[in-house]
Structures are given as structure tokens and as C-alpha cells.
Amino acid sequence: MLKIEEIKEILPHRYPFLLIDRVTEMDIEEKLFVKGYKNVSANEQFFQGHYPQEPIMPGVLQIEALAQAGAVAILSMEKFKGKTPLFAGTNKVRFKAKVVPGDRLDLYCEIVKLKGPIGIGKGIASVDGKTVCEAEILFAIG
């Protein structure tokens, strides 16, 4: 549905911190959610130090990828276009499996609460249909 160039028109993030490659499904009218993915390459900068002998995608970056998925939905809404998404916190974070080079990290983020410019998203990241990370993401739009 949205390729990387279209995502870059919505999000202010850029390499090496743009962590969503494609949006495959999005609804900003009813349920307010995004499905997308990040192809996790062996060439990612973070693998140089985390960990060179057994590369694992840092959990905080998995959460950031989920937050960026949610931000695509929010910033696609007319009233928030061109604004900056801000992290406000996380709750109920769980990591269930490793994400390694060659994985496709599937992202799902649904905005479950939105009051003015502040809200909560529920994110689930998975690899091959298995949940690897889930989190409640608190955000503000600046």
C-alpha cells in the first residue's frame, strides 16, 4: 500500500533510524491501524555492536519500529499531517523471541485511545507468524 518513498513523505525519520520499509494495510477512518514490515538486514548498523558474534535486533528498536508504524496512521490523518510524533512512554512490554538478520519483522499497531494530540497504541511485532514483541505505546503529537 505504501512504499518507502511514500512512508518518508509521512514520517520525519530517516536512515539509519527509519525502521519501517513498507505499509501493507492501513485504516485511518474506522479502526485506526497500520500493518507493515521491516526487512532486517545483516547490514544494519546496530548489528556491529549488538552482538557481533550473535547479532540480535535490540528490543528498543523493535518498539521504535512499532511506534513508527503507529505514527504512519496518526500522521496520515488530516489534522496531524506534517507534525512530529513524540514517544511518551511504554507499558506492558514483552519480548518473546530474538529478531536476527534475514528476518522480516511484521508490524501491527492499532491506536486504541486518542484524545487530542495524545494517545495510546497497541503494537505487536512478529516473525513468521510468531509474536516476538508486544507493547503499549504512549505518544504525543507535537
Curated annotation (Swiss-Prot):
Task performed by this protein: Involved in unsaturated fatty acids biosynthesis. Catalyzes the dehydration of short chain beta-hydroxyacyl-ACPs and long chain saturated and unsaturated beta-hydroxyacyl-ACPs.
Disulfide cysteine pairs (residue numbers): none
Active-site residues (renumbered): 50
HAMAP family for the chain: FabZ (MF_00406)
One GO MF term attached to the UniProt entry: (3R)-hydroxyacyl-[acyl-carrier-protein] dehydratase activity
Annotated CDD domains: FabZ (cd01288)
Protein name as catalogued: 3-hydroxyacyl-[acyl-carrier-protein] dehydratase FabZ
EC number, UniProt record: 4.2.1.59
Protein's GO biological process: fatty acid biosynthetic process; lipid A biosynthetic process
Keywords assigned by UniProt, alphabetized: Cytoplasm, Lipid A biosynthesis, Lipid biosynthesis, Lipid metabolism, Lyase
Main location: cytoplasm
Subcellular location: Cytoplasm
Alphabetical list of NCBIfam families matching this protein: fabZ (TIGR01750), PRK00006.1 (NF000582)
Catalytic activity field: a (3R)-hydroxyacyl-[ACP] = a (2E)-enoyl-[ACP] + H2O
GO CC terms of this entry: cytoplasm; membrane
Protein family per UniProt: Belongs to the thioester dehydratase family. FabZ subfamily.
One Pfam family named in its UniProt record: FabA
Source organism (scientific name): Clostridium botulinum (strain Eklund 17B / Type B)
Superkingdom to which the source organism belongs: Bacteria
